[in-house]
């Protein structure tokens, strides 16, 4: 389970402003995305390991007669597991015999990849994360027999059960001990390891598996089962961002990383990799700022992103980040209300997905100064890949000429609306670019675009 936030589109959107003959569709979103819950829910991956948990067969005891060869993760991950997954979910085993369960699972899985997968799916669908024990700090007996009997476990129990079933089904496997960026993990903390996961050999090559993080999330101190296939045969270059093994050979990477490097990286989740996002200009979790910061990400066309600035786990709705897309990149511009330490939370989803935005990436930004506030953007801005050239500050000089320049693909017309006077001023169109000098009044100013024939305009940007 990893740090993860979900947002939903706000049902009670800001009411539209109607002017005779014209309808403005106002849908306020942070950088083009509306959220149902401004505070949101934090879904967490817990630390849940102590040496006293008695791991039954960890990598310290693993005797290898051959070199550790990393597997072809793409080949194993992209296998056709639809039938195996369906069978694993249908097995309603109520007993407490490891051998009996292994025999049942083996009936449906013939190859080593199928065996590794059916164990993963069965455990993630049948073992519940023991939140109560975690919160008490007393994790109890993590032996595979007890875990199977009680159907509750923290990470060591998940890892032990996976290991025991793998062994009984003829797979070479072990428990990996290390550090995971879950709840309470302190960067730079040199204390004992806090997590356990598995390594398994498939066709003479090794793969990494975390059934705990694949089982679900914890929300408001309640476990929510939420199967995540990402943590089955996770590519080592992705898992290293969140999992650091004590024995570095189980990074399964050609280059070995130090824990100091692990601690320095941003917090990224499975959503980050699922949506094909890549870091461009900030590879460290901690960023220093002088009032305004830009984070640049490589984002595929099919991925939508949004962002939120937080302080002390609370959203700062007065300073919404500005996200602009250009040349396959998303530029996230953040301004800070005052000097201090902040969290920049980035969320993503596939454009075709009607579900929530999920937490993809986090940075900790420390600013030594107050930043100039930036304009507020609306849903239509992001949906149409608009790009604002000027002005890029939220507070405009009153009763003065202001140069407006904005690129809005697909727009038939763009206007500047002075909400204090009700004046509408069209901008000059040149291809997808709209520009012009407009005298602004003393109230809010809105940039709105028309995308269909008729008199309907949608809000793009708002100034104070």
Task: Tell what function each PLM region has.
Residues 121, 160-239:
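Hydrophobic/aromatic-rich core segments of domains that either
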Residues 20-21, 218-464:
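Alpha-helical and coiled-coil interaction segments, frequently adjacent to or embedded
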Residues 32-47:
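Hydrophobic single-pass membrane-insertion segments
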Residues 1-16:
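N-terminal Lys/Arg-rich, disordered targeting/topogenic segments
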Residues 20-36:
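Hydrophobic membrane-insertion alpha-helices, especially the h-region
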Residues 58-154, 160-164, 169:
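Secondary-structure boundary elements
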Residues 47-61:
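Short extracytoplasmic/periplasmic juxtamembrane "stem" segments immediately C-terminal to an N-terminal membrane anchor
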């Amino acid at each position: 389970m990893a740090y993860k936030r979900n947002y939903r589109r706000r049902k009670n959107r800001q009411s539209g402003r109607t002017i005779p003959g014209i309808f403005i569709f106002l849908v306020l979103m942070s950088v083009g995305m509306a959220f149902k819950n401004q505070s949101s829910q934090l879904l967490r991956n817990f630390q849940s390991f102590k040496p006293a948990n008695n791991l039954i067969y960890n990598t310290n005891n693993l005797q290898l007669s051959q070199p550790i060869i990393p597997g072809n993760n793409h080949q194993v991950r992209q296998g056709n597991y639809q039938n195996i997954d369906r069978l694993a979910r249908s097995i309603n085993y109520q007993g407490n015999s490891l051998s009996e369960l292994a025999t049942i699972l083996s009936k449906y899985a013939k190859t080593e990849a199928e065996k590794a997968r059916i164990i993963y799916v069965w455990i993630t669908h049948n073992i519940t994360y023991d939140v109560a024990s975690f919160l008490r700090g007393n994790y109890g007996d993590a032996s595979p027999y007890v875990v199977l009997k009680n159907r509750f476990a923290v990470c060591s129990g998940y890892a032990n059960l996976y290991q025991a079933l793998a062994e009984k089904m003829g797979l070479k496997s072990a428990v990996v001990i290390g550090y995971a960026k879950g709840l309470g993990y302190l960067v730079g903390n040199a204390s004992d390891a806090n997590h356990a996961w598995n390594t398994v050999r498939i066709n003479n090559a090794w793969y990494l598996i975390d059934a705990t993080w694949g089982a679900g999330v914890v929300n408001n101190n309640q476990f929510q089962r939420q199967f995540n296939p990402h943590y089955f045969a996770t590519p080592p270059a992705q898992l290293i961002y969140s999992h650091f093994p004590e024995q570095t050979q189980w990074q399964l990477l050609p280059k070995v990383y130090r824990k100091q490097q692990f601690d320095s990286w941003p917090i990224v989740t499975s959503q980050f990799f699922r949506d094909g996002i890549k870091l461009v200009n900030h590879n460290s979790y901690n960023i220093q700022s002088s009032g305004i910061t830009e984070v640049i990400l490589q984002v595929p066309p099919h991925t939508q992103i949004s962002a939120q600035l937080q302080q002390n786990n609370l959203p700062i709705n007065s300073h919404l980040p500005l996200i602009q897309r250009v040349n396959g990149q998303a530029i996230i511009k953040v301004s800070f209300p005052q000097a201090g330490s902040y969290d920049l939370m980035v969320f993503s989803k596939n454009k075709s997905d009607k579900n929530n935005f999920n937490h993809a990436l986090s940075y900790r930004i420390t600013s030594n100064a107050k930043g100039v506030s930036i304009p507020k953007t609306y849903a239509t801005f992001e949906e149409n890949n608009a790009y604002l050239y000027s002005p890029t500050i939220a507070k405009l000089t009153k009763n003065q000429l202001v140069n407006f320049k904005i690129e809005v693909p697909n727009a038939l017309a763009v206007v500047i609306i002075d909400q204090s006077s009700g004046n509408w001023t069209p901008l000059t169109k040149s291809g997808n670019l709209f520009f012009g000098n407009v005298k602004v009044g003393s109230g809010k100013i809105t940039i709105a675009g028309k995308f269909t024939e008729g008199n309907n305009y949608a809000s793009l940007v708002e100034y104070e």
